[in-house]
Amino acid sequence: LLLSLLLSLTACGKPETQLEKTAGYLQAQVAEPGVGSIGGDWLIFGLARSGIKVPQKYFDTYYNNVEAAVREKNGVLSERKYTEYSRTVLALTAIGKDPASVAGFNLLRPLADFEQVTKQGINGTIFALLALDSGNYEIPENPNAAVQATRQMYVDELLTRELPDGGWTLTGGEADVDITAMTLQALAKYREQPEVEAAVERGLAVLSSLQEPDGGYVSWGSSNSESVAQVIVALTELGVPLDDERFVKNGVTVEDALLRFAQESGAFVHVLDGSGGDDGMATEQAFYALAAIHRAETGKTTLYDMTDVMQ
C-alpha cells in the first residue's frame, strides 16, 4: 500500500517532496482515521490543508467515525477538556463539513462557554480561538454557560497571561516555546489591535532568543521536532518569512531544522537521535508545518485560515 501510494505521488516524474512523502507515510500507517489527537483529527486537518490529493473515501471514513462518536457520547466529547471540541472543529472545517451540525449536535456551542474553555488553561483558550476563527464562525448562544464568550474575551485572556518579559507558558515563570508559538498563532488575526501587535512582537523576540545555535528549539530539556513545527506555523500565520534573520542561526532556518528530524520512511522522530523511533505526534505536527510552508509559498490562505474551504 505504501509503495503504491508513493508511486502514485511520483508518477508525474518530479522528485517527491517531503510533504508528499510524509502524506504517503501517514495514509499508509493509518488506514482508517479515527477520532482523537493521533491518527485522527490532526492527521485529517494536515492532509486536508496540504493540497495533496487524498481519496474522498478517506475523509468520509473520518467523518463517519466522528458522527458515530458524537452520537455515542450524546454530543459531549469531554466535560473537562474543551480542546476536544476545538480540535474536532478544526478537522471538520478543513474537510468542508459543518461543525454546527454533526449527528444533530452543534460542536461550536461548547466553545461559547468562557469559563469551561478557560478552566482547562491557556491551551483551551488558544484552540477555541483558532477553531472559531478557522471558518469565521459566529459564536452561538450557549444557555448553559455561566459566562457567554466573545472573541475579544478570549483575546484579552491570552493578553493577560503574557509573561512580564514576553511569551507565554503552561505553568511556571519562563516562556515555553510551544505555548508561545501557539499563542501567536491564535493572536495572528488580531494584530490590528495595538496591544496584540505589541504582545506579538514581544513573543517573536522571545522565540528568536530561544532558538538554538543549530536553528532548532528545546522544550522540556530536549531539542525536538514538535517545538520547531509550532514555531514554523506561528511564523507562517503571522506572515513572517522563514528566512527572516531573526530566525536563522548560523545559516540554518527553522525549515532546515525541522527536516533534520525526517526519516527515509517519510516519518519524523521526536528527538534527533531517534531513540523513540518514528513518532506519530511528531510526524503529524511536522506534516502540518510543512503544509503551512507550502501554503505560504503558493500564496494560499494560512494553515488555520480556512475561509478558502468555506467559499
Language-model features and meaning:
Residues L1-S8:
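Bacterial N-terminal signal peptides
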Residues C12-Q311:
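Preference for long, amphipathic alpha-helical scaffolds in soluble/luminal domains
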